[in-house]
Design a protein with these regions (language model features):
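Catalytic cores of nucleotide-enabled group-transfer and carboxylate-activating enzymes in metabolic
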Residues: 1, 13-17
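A short, well-structured beta->alpha microelement
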Residues: 1-9, 118-137
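Intrinsically disordered or low-complexity boundary/linker segments at protein termini
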Residues: 16-110, 115-128, 139-143, 149-166
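Solvent-exposed alpha-helical segments within well-ordered globular domains of core cellular machineries
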Residues: 4-11, 38, 83
Length: 166
């Protein structure tokens, strides 16, 4: 199937970043992510998987709003996804707002000191149960980026499963 072909290509070419579009549910029994993306999540382990659901052209984005789970700074991929967000914000010349708990915010601020050209701000997200609070601060022109983790990793939270329903 298509997912297996993609996984084989990713592994044989040592691809580190994979960007895929999210599908639109065809019927009520479809999952939010769809079978192919679910297979990609299960079939990859060392890749940065970016699932993108464009609602508007990327050049119309005015601000990135990034929700970061607690302990994300302890994950191997922390520097990688931060670098991707930094690159997007730099290329578009837009600000970034990070929502994270106190410890994760400290780590994010250290990363931002290295990249002083970034226009960043921080808001507290004490608990992932407060995820919906972010929606009150989303403005027209914002793009929401949700950092998640794979099951059985330090920053994984069972509440990630509910994100599609928000």
């Amino acid at each position: 199937n298509i997912a297996n072909c993609i996984i084989n290509t990713v592994q044989s070419n040592k691809i580190t970043d994979l960007i895929v579009g999210i599908h639109h549910k065809a019927n009520i029994v479809d999952t939010f992510l769809g079978g192919m993306i679910t297979s990609l999540i299960n079939g990859t382990s060392n890749q940065n998987l970016i699932i993108y659901g464009p609602k508007k052209p990327i050049n119309s984005v005015k601000r990135l709003v990034v929700a970061v789970p607690q302990m994300a700074e302890l994950e191997v991929g922390f520097d990688v996804w931060f670098d991707r967000i930094k690159n997007i914000a730099s290329q578009l010349s837009i600000p970034v707002v990070f929502y994270a708990n106190k410890n994760t915010t400290i780590a994010l601020k250290k990363q931002c000191e290295i990249h002083s050209s970034l226009n960043v701000s921080f808001r507290e997200l004490a608990s992932w149960e407060d995820f919906l609070i972010i929606s009150k601060h989303i403005k027209h022109g914002d793009t929401l980026i949700v950092i998640t983790a794979r099951k059985a990793t330090l920053s994984y939270n069972n509440l990630f499963e509910k994100i599609p329903y928000y």
